C-alpha cells in the first residue's frame, strides 16, 4: 500500500483529462493540472497519465501546480529508483490502462474526428450531408455502419501508446539539460523561451516516430462508408492505410500536416504558460493562494482555454491528413487555413471541440476506476496509460 503514495490521485487525473486536443497523440495521451505534492513530482516527470492528445504531460511551475505541457519524451533511462523488472511491470500495466481508457473513450473520439473532418469527407464523396451535432453523428454512424464501428481506428490509437512511452524514457532529460534555464536565475523570458524550445524539440522528436500511427488512426476513424459507391470503405484496416498511402503519396503522405503539428506544440505551451503566469498572481492571492480547489479550477480553465485557442491547428493538420490519396491537396498548412476560412468560415476550425471535452472526461473516469481495481486486486497501483 505504501506505493500508492507515489501515484496520482483521481483529481490529478481528472484535472488533466479536460485538456482539449490530442494527442497528437496523439497521445495524449499524462496531463496533470492539479496542485502537485512532492511524492508525485518525480513520477509525473517520467510518466504520462492522460489519454490521448497532442500536447500533454506535466511539469512543475511556480505555485506548486503540476501543469500539462507537451508530451516531452526526453532522453533518459528508466527511473533510477526502480528496478528493471518493476519498470517493465509499470510499463505493461500502463499499457493495459491506456488500452482500457482509450477503448472506453473511442466512440466519442471517433465522433469528434468525424465532426472535425466532415467537410473533407463531403468533398471526397464519403459523406452525403453534414452532421447536425454529436447526437446526430452517433445516430447516423450506428445506423449506417453498426455499433461496433464506433471503435474504428482504436487499435492504432492503443498501439501508439507503447512507442510513445518508450520514446518518453529514451529521450528523457536530454532537451531539459540542453535548455536548462531557471526562472529565478535566468529571468522569466529566458526561462519561457527555453521552455518553448525544449518542449517543441522534444515533442517534435517524439511526434516524428509516432505520427504515421496518428495519421492511420485519423484516416480509419474518418473512413465512413461511402455515400456514393454502395457503402464501400476506403481502407480495410491499419496495414491497408499504410499500403495505399505509400502507393499514392509515398512517405510524404504519412507525414502530411506534421509541420503544423510541431507548431501546435509550441503554441499550446506558449498559451498555457503565458496565461498561467499572467493570471495566477492576480487570482490565487490571499486565502486562495494555497487552496487546492482554486488551483485545480485555475488549471482546468487555463488548460481548456489554451486547448480551445490552439484547436484550429489540430483541425488544420487533420484536414491535411485527409487529403493524402486525394487528387486535390492543400499546398501547405497556411493554404489549408486560408481555404477553410474562406469557404467554410472560422466556425469550421472548431468543429468537434465539444466532443473532445466529453472524450477527455470519459477517459478520466475510466482511468480513475482502473486505479481502484488495481488496488483491489493487487494491493497497489501500477502504471497508468497516457499519451
Swiss-Prot record:
It is a multi-pass membrane protein. The keyword Membrane applies. PROSITE patterns: SOLCAR. Solcar repeats lie at residues 85-178, 190-282, 290-376. One of its GO terms (molecular function) is ATP:ADP antiporter activity. It catalyses: ADP(in) + ATP(out) = ADP(out) + ATP(in). It is found in: Mitochondrion inner membrane. Belongs to the mitochondrial carrier (TC 2.A.29) family. Monomer. This is ADP,ATP carrier protein 2, mitochondrial.
Amino acid at each position: 500500500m505504501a506505493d500508492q503514495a507515489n501515484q496520482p490521485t483521481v483529481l490529478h487525473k481528472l484535472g488533466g483529462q479536460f485538456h482539449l486536443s490530442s494527442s497528437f497523440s496523439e497521445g495524449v495521451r499524462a496531463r496533470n493540472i492539479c496542485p502537485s505534492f512532492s511524492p508525485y513530482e518525480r513520477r509525473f516527470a517520467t510518466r504520462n497519465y492522460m489519454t490521448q492528445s497532442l500536447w500533454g504531460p506535466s511539469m512543475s511551475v511556480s505555485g506548486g501546480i503540476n501543469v500539462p505541457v507537451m508530451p516531452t519524451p526526453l532522453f533518459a533511462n528508466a527511473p533510477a529508483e526502480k528496478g528493471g523488472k518493476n519498470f517493465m511491470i509499470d510499463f505493461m500495466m500502463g499499457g493495459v490502462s491506456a488500452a482500457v481508457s482509450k477503448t472506453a473513450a473511442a466512440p466519442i473520439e471517433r465522433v469528434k474526428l468525424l465532426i472535425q473532418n466532415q467537410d473533407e469527407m463531403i468533398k471526397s464523396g464519403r459523406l452525403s450531408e453534414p452532421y447536425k451535432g454529436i447526437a446526430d453523428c452517433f445516430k447516423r454512424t450506428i445506423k449506417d455502419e453498426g455499433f461496433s464501428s464506433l471503435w474504428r481506428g482504436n487499435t492504432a490509437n492503443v498501439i501508439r501508446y507503447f512507442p510513445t512511452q518508450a520514446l518518453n524514457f529514451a529521450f528523457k532529460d536530454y532537451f531539459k539539460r540542453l535548455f536548462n534555464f531557471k526562472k529565478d536565475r535566468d529571468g522569466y523570458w529566458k526561462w519561457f523561451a527555453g521552455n518553448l524550445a525544449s518542449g517543441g524539440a522534444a515533442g517534435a522528436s517524439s511526434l516524428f516516430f509516432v505520427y504515421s500511427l496518428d495519421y492511420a488512426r485519423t484516416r480509419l476513424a474518418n473512413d465512413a462508408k461511402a455515400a456514393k459507391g454502395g457503402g464501400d470503405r476506403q481502407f480495410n484496416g491499419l496495414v491497408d492505410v499504410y499500403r495505399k498511402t505509400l502507393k499514392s503519396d509515398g512517405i510524404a503522405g504519412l507525414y502530411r500536416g506534421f509541420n503544423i503539428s510541431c507548431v501546435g506544440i509550441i503554441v499550446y505551451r506558449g498559451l498555457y504558460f503565458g496565461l498561467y503566469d499572467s493570471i495566477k498572481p492576480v487570482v490565487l492571492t490571499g486565502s486562495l493562494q494555497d487552496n487546492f480547489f482554486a488551483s485545480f479550477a485555475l488549471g482546468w480553465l487555463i488548460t481548456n482555454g489554451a486547448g480551445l485557442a490552439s484547436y484550429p491547428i489540430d483541425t488544420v493538420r487533420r484536414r491535411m491528413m485527409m487529403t493524402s490519396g486525394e487528387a486535390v491537396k492543400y499546398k501547405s498548412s497556411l493554404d489549408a487555413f486560408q481555404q477553410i476560412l474562406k469557404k467554410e468560415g472560422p466556425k469550421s476550425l472548431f468543429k468537434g471541440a465539444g466532443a473532445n471535452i466529453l472524450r477527455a472526461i470519459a477517459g478520466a473516469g475510466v482511468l480513475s476506476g482502473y486505479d481502484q481495481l488495481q488496488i483491489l486486486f493487487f494491493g497497489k497501483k501500477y502504471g497508468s496509460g497516457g499519451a
